[in-house]
Amino acid sequence: MLRRLLERPCTLALLVGSQLAVMMYLSLGGFRSLSALFGRDQGPTFDYSHPRDVYSNLSHLPGAPVAAGASPAEALPFCPERSPFLVGPVSVSFSPVPSLAEIVERNPRVEPGGRYRPAGCEARSRTAIIVPHRAREHHLRLLLYHLHPFLQRQQLAYGIYVIHQAGNGMFNRAKLLNVGVREALRDEEWDCLFLHDVDLLPENDHNLYVCDPRGPRHVAVAMNKFGYSLPYPQYFGGVSALTPDQYLKMNGFPNEYWGWGGEDDDIATRVRLAGMKISRPPTSVGHYKMVKHRGDKGNEENPHRFDLLVRTQNSWTQDGMNSLTYQLLAKELGPLYTNITADIGTDPRGPRAPSGPRYPPGSSQAFRQEMLQRRPPARPGPLPTANHTAPHGSH
């Protein structure tokens, strides 16, 4: 009887339909969970149509700042977890470009080397902002103008490091960040390292420049370049935050990506291979505007990036902080930042003409081309047991 019932077409259709319904229900729930996991939830609501001036509330900050390295006469209470001076969305303007003298005048509390400590309370985080740089003076001034008041309202102890690549060779963003991390950690035991592109300006001071002890944070989740959304789940570009331990656990960033493209995906793969997970602020908080610019000479598209990405699983323990070499040419304490100039060498592979049409790096056409050429990441194997601690000593 049961056998004949199961053999009827209508019964089989009913069973198959029930299974599909259950699978769809579970899948929808799974996608909702993944959405929350990757930070695509909108989070709190902010009105970006009425931003505040980026220098709002600075006059309300208490007292004179504590000079870097100085000890207060008596123990101070910790600053609140969320500063009362935050204003939410702030206006970001690219014109006119302020002079360095104007920025210094607007930020009298900033100490030499771009250092700041809040007065009246002990900062909960000591954050080093590390900016790779070459031939982007206007972008750098815009970043300094917006970032200093932004960070002061968050009541952080911070320092800004600008890492300048000497010479005219191909630009290497990731290697410059490794240089900046090493030099910054020689100055102070920073709690948090913010790796920050020079052309990205934050639009919401609720986007706190602090690290997540659970794992690396990707902070620039909603750029105007991508329509204020995450371009793909593994994206780790623009602005990211790691504790020194997290940075060393993944052996820092790769040194072999000369030119534009590829290093962000290598870094995201390193996070996974080191047994960590990426966290993100809500989309409504992690807003950034990118300063418009043309393609940079010396930062052309990297034709080797896909070959390098295929090897990341096997190369990440050998290419990074433990293989970093450079010559420190200058380390100067300017009024708004610590300037580090380094000779990081040149691409040993030399130039190679990329296949297909060439678009300006960072353009929408270049991004689409990269998505079409992107190879699927290799499956992660067992984690290596190598010692990931960067050696101390010579460069």
Swiss-Prot record:
Residue numbers on the Lumenal membrane side: 32-395
Residue segments, region Disordered: 341-395
Cited function: Responsible for the synthesis of complex-type N-linked oligosaccharides in many glycoproteins as well as the carbohydrate moieties of glycolipids.
Pathway annotation: Protein modification; protein glycosylation
GO CC annotations on file: cytosol; Golgi cisterna membrane
Transmembrane segments: 11-31
One family name in Pfam for this protein: Glyco_transf_7N
Compartment annotation: Golgi apparatus, Golgi stack membrane
Lineage: Eukaryota, Metazoa, Chordata, Craniata, Vertebrata
Source organism of this protein record: Cricetulus griseus
Cytoplasmic side, ranges: 1-10
EC number: 2.4.1.-, 2.4.1.38, 2.4.1.90, 2.4.1.275
Residues bound to N-acetyl-D-glucosamine: G262, E263, D264, D265, R305
One GO term of the biological process aspect: galactosylceramide biosynthetic process
Reaction equations catalysed: an N-acetyl-beta-D-glucosaminyl derivative + UDP-alpha-D-galactose = a beta-D-galactosyl-(1->4)-N-acetyl-beta-D-glucosaminyl derivative + UDP + H(+); N-acetyl-D-glucosamine + UDP-alpha-D-galactose = beta-D-galactosyl-(1->4)-N-acetyl-D-glucosamine + UDP + H(+); a beta-D-GlcNAc-(1->3)-beta-D-Gal-(1->4)-beta-D-Glc-(1<->1)-Cer(d18:1(4E)) + UDP-alpha-D-galactose = a neolactoside nLc4Cer(d18:1(4E)) + UDP + H(+); a beta-D-glucosylceramide + UDP-alpha-D-galactose = a beta-D-galactosyl-(1->4)-beta-D-glucosyl-(1<->1)-ceramide + UDP + H(+)
GO molecular function: beta-N-acetylglucosaminylglycopeptide beta-1,4-galactosyltransferase activity; metal ion binding; N-acetyllactosamine synthase activity
Binding-site positions, Mn(2+): D199, H293
Gene3D superfamilies found in the cross-reference section: Spore Coat Polysaccharide Biosynthesis Protein SpsA, Chain A
Major localization class: Golgi
Protein name according to UniProt: Beta-1,4-galactosyltransferase 3
Glycosylation sites (chain numbering): N57, N339, N387
SUPFAM superfamilies xrefs: Nucleotide-diphospho-sugar transferases
Disulfide bonds listed in the record: C79-C121, C192-C211
Protein's membrane topology: Single-pass type II membrane protein
Name of encoding gene: B4GALT3
InterPro entries, per the entry: Galactosyl_T, Galactosyl_T_C, Galactosyl_T_N, Nucleotide-diphossugar_trans
